[in-house]
Amino acid sequence: MSVLTLDFTKFHSGSEVERRAFGQALLDGFTTTGFVKLINHGFSKEEMADIFNWNQRFFDLPIDRKAAIRNDEGPKPQRGWSSLGAEKTGFLNPGGKLSLARASNNDRQDAKEHFDIGPAEDEEFQNKWPEEQTLPGFQETMNSYFDRSQAITLELLEALALAMDVPKDTFVGLCHGHASELRLNHYPSIPVKTIEEGKTNRIWPHTDFGIITLLAQDDIGGLEIQDRNHPSDFLPVNREDSTEFVVNIGDILERWTNGRLRAGLHQVTTPRSMQQKGNGTLPTRRSVAFFLKPHRQMSVASISHFVPGNQSPRYEDMTALAYQQLRTGIVY
């Protein structure tokens, strides 16, 4: 099982034939593995290096500066800084399935800290920023990266609708007044032995809460996706180019398509090259994840087009905000 690499220019500026071929390849990749890689999306190597530099600069801030914008834990969209181990993904996806139940893995710990923002114009759940003099230019850069990622992911939804032979706005039309989120992840260095003991992971197997995710990762390794041919196994997805994105299906797209497209189960753990090195230490790892999400009051029930006429929908009606609250509530 391998992850397809797609050239975004084939859809963004391609001919009608190229756009349809891109959409079909995207659908094939999502159907087979739940993941694709995306290149030539408009972010340069310099811009990607810059966002990772901001990642480092933010997490290098003194604890008291980060604590001043701490995320208020609970069942709501995350905003600001979450300390090491605050979020517990070991509670998610019992049995590796999309579920609103809480797993009983109450002794599992995450070895990561993260910083989350939503749309700049969000008045309901406002962003929390370091003071401008602390990190001059940080807020502007993050907001710009957010907006460009939003545009890319909306085009991917258009491509998917084209391949699935549904109206162009089937998915995109639910994203006006969106509630997308952007996250910086920092996984501090950690002894290999700590992870091998089985109580701590960089991030446990889980699916993402949104529609699709756009992930940029450094070259340290450790990202693994479920092998759908052998569901108890995971396969590494290493970075091959500094500008590539890993794109995966989230919960809401699985729900909208009535399970036709399945959310991609993934984890971050010890890279294969470091396994069985009990005395070794995993180096610091960084990533940047953009989570495309719909308007908060839009439904995340199965869309009627994907429900056969003689069957009931697999996923019940609830708003995107209610779904987010249920899922976020599980990890705290």
From Swiss-Prot:
Cofactor note: Binds 1 Fe(2+) ion per subunit.
UniProt GO MF annotations: dioxygenase activity; metal ion binding
InterPro entries: DIOX_N (IPR026992), IPNS-like_FE2OG_OXY (IPR044861), IPNS-like_sf (IPR027443), Iron_ascorbate_oxido_reductase (IPR050231), Oxoglu/Fe-dep_dioxygenase_dom (IPR005123)
Cofactor(s), by name: Fe(2+)
Gene3D superfamilies noted in UniProt: B-lactam Antibiotic, Isopenicillin N Synthase, Chain
Enzyme class name: oxidoreductase
Pfam family, one: DIOX_N
Positions annotated to bind Fe cation: 206, 208, 266
Protein's pathway: Antifungal biosynthesis
Enzyme Commission identifier(s): 1.14.-.-
Limits of the Fe2OG dioxygenase domain: 178-294
GO process annotations (BP): small molecule biosynthetic process
Biotechnology section: Due to their effectiveness as antifungal agents, echinocandin derivatives can be used for the treatment of human invasive candidiasis.
Keywords in alphabetical order: Dioxygenase, Iron, Metal-binding, Oxidoreductase
Residues binding 2-oxoglutarate: 285
Family recorded in the similarity comment: Belongs to the iron/ascorbate-dependent oxidoreductase family.
Function noted in UniProt: 2-oxoglutarate-dependent dioxygenase; part of the gene cluster that mediates the biosynthesis of echinocandin B, a fungal lipidated cyclic hexapeptide that acts as an antifungal agent. Linoleoyl-AMP, produced by the fatty-acyl-AMP ligase ecdI, is transferred to the initiation carrier domain (T0) of ecdA. The linoleoyl-S-phosphopantetheinyl-T0 is sequentially extended with L-ornithine, L-threonine, L-proline, L-homotyrosine, L-threonine, and 4R-methyl-L-proline to form the linear hexapeptide.
Protein name per UniProt: 2-oxoglutarate-dependent dioxygenase ecdK
Organism listed in the record: Aspergillus rugulosus
Name of the gene this protein is made from: ecdK
